[in-house]
């Protein structure tokens, strides 16, 4: 009988110990979940605060410095519902180019002329100008007076856009880039489209800019030239900032 009582007491003690241990585990789990929840809340709070570290004016000023200090870049120009008209009734549908300040430019363009799609390349540096024959694709030297690109200045395009935009506003912050909407007067886009513009027209633009000021993309939306529509969008993408570019005169046969 004595042994039975002792065993009974031992069982009660073990049961109480197990209850305490299980209760302790529950508390630990709850505390762990509590700490994890607090950590997640803090991280979300920090991320939401760090998403927009600059105002639109601040990020544009940073971008001005970045653009002014950059010596080279590459770009592409495409269109949605339109094209860019150059002298000689040349309608650029697509173009890509390489730029080195102050005066080195290479452009490869697809041009629609008299309902024909033509491809030509244009190169200039050291006050010399070359262009390819759209039929033979062979290079030839040209005087600047015959240069179809003489009214545009790709080197100046991004400078004009970033320095002359107005009413800028951050619309979103995605993939570590600021998406900004703004307006610009059509006269300030002559470096892109030349003199064939609708004067004094307020034009909507959208910019994607990295926190270091690097410009990824600019959308120019609406009417800039006489044949544009409200749905015309010029899409300019920039890349390879400050990467070395090799320049040499084309081989002319």
Regions found by a protein language model. Give the residues of each.
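Flexible, processing/modification-adjacent segments and terminal tails
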Residues: 131-191, 195-197
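Short, hydrophobic/aromatic-rich segments at coil-to-beta transitions
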Residues: 71-74, 101-108, 175-181, 214-217
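Gly/Pro-enriched, hydrophobic low-complexity segments
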Residues: 178-252
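Hydrophobic lipid-interacting interfaces of membrane-associated proteins
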Residues: 78-84, 112-116, 134-136, 223-227, ...
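N-terminal leader/targeting segments and the immediate start of mature chains
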Residues: 39-104, 243-253
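Extended lipid/amphipathic-ligand handling interfaces
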Residues: 59-65, 94-101, 120-129, 204-211, ...
């Amino acid at each position: 009988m004595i042994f039975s009582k002792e065993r009974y007491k031992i069982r009660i003690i073990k049961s109480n110990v197990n209850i305490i241990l299980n209760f302790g585990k529950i508390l630990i789990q709850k505390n762990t979940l509590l700490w994890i929840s607090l950590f997640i809340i803090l991280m979300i709070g920090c991320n939401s605060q760090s998403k927009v570290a600059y105002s639109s004016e601040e990020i544009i000023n940073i971008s001005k410095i970045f653009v002014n200090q950059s010596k080279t870049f590459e770009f592409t120009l495409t269109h949605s519902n339109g094209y860019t008209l150059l002298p000689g009734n040349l309608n650029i549908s697509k173009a890509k180019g390489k730029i080195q300040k102050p005066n080195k430019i290479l452009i490869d363009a697809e041009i629609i002329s008299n309902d024909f799609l033509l491809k030509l390349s244009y190169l200039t540096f050291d006050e010399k100008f070359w262009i390819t024959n759209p039929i033979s694709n062979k290079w030839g030297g040209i005087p600047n007076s015959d240069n179809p690109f003489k009214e545009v200045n790709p080197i100046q395009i991004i400078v004009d856009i970033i320095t002359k935009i107005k009413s800028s506003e951050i619309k979103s912050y995605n993939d570590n880039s600021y998406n900004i909407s703004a307006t610009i007067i059509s006269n300030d886009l002559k470096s892109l489209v030349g003199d064939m513009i609708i004067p004094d027209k307020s034009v909507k633009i959208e910019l994607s800019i990295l926190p270091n000021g690097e410009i990824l993309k600019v959308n120019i939306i609406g009417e800039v030239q006489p044949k544009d529509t409200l749905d015309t969008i010029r899409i300019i993408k920039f890349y390879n900032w400050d990467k070395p570019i090799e320049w040499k005169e084309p081989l002319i046969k």
